[in-house]
Amino acid sequence: MTPPPNSISSRNVAVIGAGAAGLVAARELRREGHTVTIFERQKQVGGLWVCTPNVEPDLLSIDPDRTVVHSSVYQSLRTNLPRECMGYSDFPFVTRPDDESRDPRRYPDHREVMRYLQDFAKEFKIEEMIRFETEVFRVEPTAENSCKWRVQFRSSSGVSGEDIFDAVVICNGHFTEPRLAHIPGIESWPGKQIHSHNYRVSDPFKGQVVIVIGYQSSGSDISRDIAILAKEVHIAAKSDAYAKESSIYSNLHFHPTIDRVYEDGSVVFQDGKLIFADAIVHCTGYKYCFPFLETKGYVNVEDNRVGPLYKHVFPPALAPGLSFIGLPSMALQFFMFEIQSRWVASVLSGRVKLPSEEQMMEDVIAFYAKLKSLGIPKRFTHFLTDPQWTPMFEKLKPHEAVLISQSEYFNWIAEQCGCSSIERWREEQYNIAIKKDDDNFRDEWDDDDQIIQEAYRDFAKFKPSKVWST
């Protein structure tokens, strides 16, 4: 697994994106001895955590020629996980008592996460690797069977250029291109429609009857945010489990999915109940989108499956020169970015070996076949979770838990790299948090104090960051 020291090599690597994935990818690559260039279209680090009041002119984000806004952060957004388990392994996301402008809450708002990422970039001198306000519009192999990659880019001033790299790591996120559910009659429904990507504040829905489609993180948050000002909020969700939800909001109602909508403004649910509504908010998730990537068919996106990819990271035919960080959802994102990046960096240096292309493809094909045999749609390929905690997989039997848990996934990567995997306390905090009551869980929690103390004992191993005293 580990080659002799003289076979370790340094690569010239491009990282696409300076969000939470791109920042830690750059750090891990440089730690492994690689030369790194990060391309970031915005003026600052942070990726999806960069909050802007701007929304797209097409509130459903259907128009392919629209001006794209690359943030989906709404004003009231707070983390849905406690800060201790959110951070990178060796850069604790703890409170900042030395700075009164910081959010000290255990479930802080989006601004605090943004400040944490800025602190991380400063501590590890990552900004010196970034080309800000530079959009990548083409990534492709330089030639057939080539081990080099051409990256073409354009600055905000309109100046274009290209560079050649040994490898490209894709960290562009997947919260920009919305998915929409198919609803019969929606084209002629007269009310206002908006995707959560373009939701910022609840004011436009004051006094209205609002339908919220979807009840994952954004649907849960946004429905409650709107309920403060709206006349009624009706949530349409796929799982029967949501029908059992209770809420402190008397105007918040749960329904099964929508059967059809009509020109008179009515919305009919699968159980036959009819509501006349003023607006529909689509909290229906996002599509994986890589408009800049040209691989001559080696990597495709089909029904939100990016593939073929070995362990959600490497396309067998193009490995290790092309890799993806952060595709799996329903997992501890920052920790996952970090351990995936460590694996990629180690493979690129030659310190860790991948299986052959044929062996990787066999693994991918077997995984896809298992998903198909269980009737799991392609769009759930990158769900990294225990099915018993995910209502959409509630009909699966325990032995059918083909979607491996995040701890199994992290442990497997850690074994490849010879590094530490997820800490016990971090996993337990995550498991507790995802089962919390939606109304109050951010301000009322019953975590075992020993788990929290264990986290802070781990944090004490790391020297206080220089940024804490600035």
UniProtKB/Swiss-Prot annotation:
Pfam families reported in the protein's UniProt record: FMO-like (PF00743)
Keywords: FAD, Flavoprotein, Monooxygenase, NADP, Oxidoreductase
GO biological process, any: response to abscisic acid
Binding sites annotated in the UniProt record for FAD: 17-22
EC numbers on record: 1.8.-.-
Enzyme kind, highest EC tier: oxidoreductase
Cross-referenced InterPro entries: FAD/NAD-bd_sf, Flavin_mOase, Flavin_mOase-like, FMO-like
Cofactors, names only: FAD
Organism domain of life: Eukaryota
Binding locations of NADP(+): 214-219
One Gene Ontology molecular-function label: NADP binding
Function field: Catalyzes the conversion of methylthioalkyl glucosinolates of any chain length into methylsulfinylalkyl glucosinolates.
Family membership noted in the UniProt record: Belongs to the FMO family.
The protein, known as: Flavin-containing monooxygenase FMO GS-OX-like 6
